[in-house]
From Swiss-Prot:
Location relative to the cell: Cytoplasm
EC number: 3.2.2.27
Enzyme class: hydrolase
Gene Ontology MF: a single term: uracil DNA N-glycosylase activity
PANTHER family: URACIL-DNA GLYCOSYLASE (PTHR11264:SF0)
InterPro entries xrefs: UDG_fam1, Ura-DNA_Glyclase_AS, Uracil-DNA_glycosylase-like, Uracil-DNA_glycosylase-like_sf
NCBIfam families: PRK05254.1-1, PRK05254.1-2, PRK05254.1-4, PRK05254.1-5, ung
Annotated protein name in UniProt: Uracil-DNA glycosylase
Length: 223
């Protein structure tokens, strides 16, 4: 059974990856606040092993406010206000999935544990500065992640919301995988087709058709 180490081990030895890690370390050492904390940068891979991935949701870069980002796209830690994009994701789930109750928090760990890879395409950001690390090499790394999933797995469901994610997904083999596209759930664009897209029920239909366990999208209350 292949692991992330098997498919990305060589990638992490590449010069560009070392340069990205050096850049982020220097930013932190210079006193800049970088999100998420160093221990959380690779959480998407920690919580969803390569062989367990069923669904891929692509984000852009991490939330850049205090205490928000923790390495899973769109997710925030318990106790942090649910960000606007995730509010819209919950609205669509409530519309799309019978019985879905809108949670009071935005902690999406249970999705990751069921095989939903919550992957930002840029894995770090400077506090208060959206896209500040966009050209630091992360994009190349996450391209390789998507390429590895495309090549070594079959029947994955990719949810590509917004132009950035759709551009990243242009090399996914549509014969091997399912690709669902919609506008970004941000308040700026959700009304253009994200709300009403039905991606969550469609995802579960694809999984069920392939004799895979569907995702339980309901987020349980924090005890």
């Amino acid at each position: 059974m292949q692991t992330w180490s098997d498919v990305l081990g060589q990638e992490k030895k590449q010069a560009y990856f070392q340069e990205t890690m050096d850049f982020v370390r220097r930013e932190r050492e210079a006193g800049k606040i970088v999100y998420p904390p160093a221990a959380d940068v690779f959480n998407a891979f920690k919580y969803t092993e390569f062989a367990d991935v069923k669904v891929v949701i692509l984000g852009q870069d991490p939330y850049h406010g205090p205490n928000q980002a923790h390495g899973l796209c769109f997710s925030v830690l318990p106790g942090v206000a649910v960000p606007p994009s995730l509010v819209n994701i919950y609205k669509e789930l409530h519309r799309d999935i019978p019985g879905f109750e809108i949670p009071s928090h935005g902690y999406l760990l249970s999705w990751a544990q069921q095989g939903v890879l919550l992957l930002n395409t840029v894995l770090t950001v400077e506090a208060g500065k959206a896209h500040s690390h966009a050209s630091s090499g992360w994009e190349h790394f996450t391209d390789r992640v998507i390429a590895a999933l495309n090549e070594h797995r079959e029947g994955l469901v990719f949810l590509l919301w917004g132009n950035h994610a759709q551009k990243k997904g242009q090399y996914i083999d549509r014969q091997r995988h399912h690709v669902l596209m919609a506008p970004h759930p941000s308040p700026l664009s959700a009304h253009r087709g994200f709300l009403g897209c039905g991606h969550f029920s469609q995802t579960n239909q694809f999984l069920t058709d392939a004799d895979k366990q569907p995702i339980n999208w309901q987020i349980a209350p924090i005890a």
